Amino acid sequence: MELAVVSVLGADRVGIVAGISSVLAKHNVNIVDISQTVVQNIFSMVMIVDISKADVDISQLRRELEEEGKRLGVMVAVYHIDVFKYMQRI
């Protein structure tokens, strides 16, 4: 398994989870874990995804998710899980 973290933040609206998930599914990316919440109309979601069978590299996936985020009016960030592992060592 090769893991990445997808973070989404913005004003709550219909279709955010569907839009982000559709980009992931299109590229054969599996959602391993997901947490989402809405606080005072602010939507927040973090996904752990398996990119090992993806048909694009993480850079292309990031670009497409960011573009989908713009369409949805939310901010999307994508990081390889190793970034967080290295941060814990500092």
Curated annotation (Swiss-Prot):
It comes from the Archaea. CDD domains: ACT_1ZPV. Pfam families: ACT_6. One of its GO terms (biological process) is DNA-templated transcription. Transmembrane segments: none annotated. Residues 5-74 form the ACT domain. GO terms for cellular component: cytosol. SUPFAM superfamilies: ACT-like (SSF55021). Belongs to the UPF0237 family. PANTHER family: UPF0237 PROTEIN MJ1558. This is UPF0237 protein PAE3582. It comes from Pyrobaculum aerophilum (strain ATCC 51768 / DSM 7523 / JCM 9630 / CIP 104966 / NBRC 100827 / IM2).
